[in-house]
Amino acid sequence: MKYKNIFLTGSTGILGKPLLKKLVNEGHSVFALSRNKLNNDFLISNNAKIISGDLFNDDIYEQLKEKSIEAIFHVAGENKKCQKDPSGMFKTNIEGTKQMLELGNKLNIEKFIYTSSAATLGEKKGSIGDEDSTHRGTFLSDYEESKYLAEEVAFAFKKEFEFVSINPSSVQGPGRMSGTAKLMISTLNKKFPPLIKSSVSVVDIDDCTEGHYL
């Protein structure tokens, strides 16, 4: 990757942590968004430059405008299943993504890399779906719908800068204890009965990190 100065969101999540380390180890200057000061020790120890705030803070631009940011990795997102009120997740995943896209436009970046989900892609019976597969038009979860709609917003910015959407399946690795990881662990520990002919697509965190960097 040719870009020197990079802004990274979601830098302390399961994917953000190894991606931050990868970027720094490859010689990039990483400006990491931090909404919680408790995470700052991790960021500082990994040579990231801290940008304080969350996806909706207007002063992020002021903190970055003199940093010559060339690319944004927008990894931050919310993934919670079976919420009674998913409006917070929709705000984070859709409006938060739009905020970062508009930030990239103001910063005159060259490239925006967005962490989406395989759930936004269509299926192909008997084969693996890809970006050319037509989505079924219905959603299995609020999370899937929020990521699909976020992509729709993001693609509108393709004329402003190079836009890349990364669509991993269920990311698994050290430290992952919730979501599908919790389900698989419970099944292995015989605390949850396995479903006949059920399956889930998974991707190793290291492979996912490399895919983002490429």
What function would you assign to each model-found segment?
Residues 42, 48-95, 103:
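NAD(P)H-binding glycine-rich loop region in Rossmannoid oxidoreductase-like domains
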Residues 152-174:
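Conserved beta-loop-beta element that borders a ligand/cofactor-binding pocket
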Residues 95-143:
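Conserved Rossmann-fold NAD(P)-dependent oxidoreductase catalytic core, especially the SDR/UDP-sugar
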Residues 81, 118-128, 142, 171-177, ...:
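Conserved catalytic-site region of short-chain dehydrogenase/reductase
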Residues 185-203, 207, 211:
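A conserved pocket-lining segment of Rossmann-fold NAD(P)-dependent short-chain dehydrogenase/reductase
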Residues 4-26:
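N-terminal Rossmann NAD(P)H-binding glycine-rich loop of SDR-like oxidoreductase domains
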Residues 160-161, 172-183, 214:
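Glycine/proline-rich active-site loop of Rossmann-fold NAD(P)-dependent oxidoreductases
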Residues 88-99, 145-146, 203:
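Glycine-rich NAD(P)-binding loop of the Rossmann-fold in SDR/ketoreductase-type enzymes
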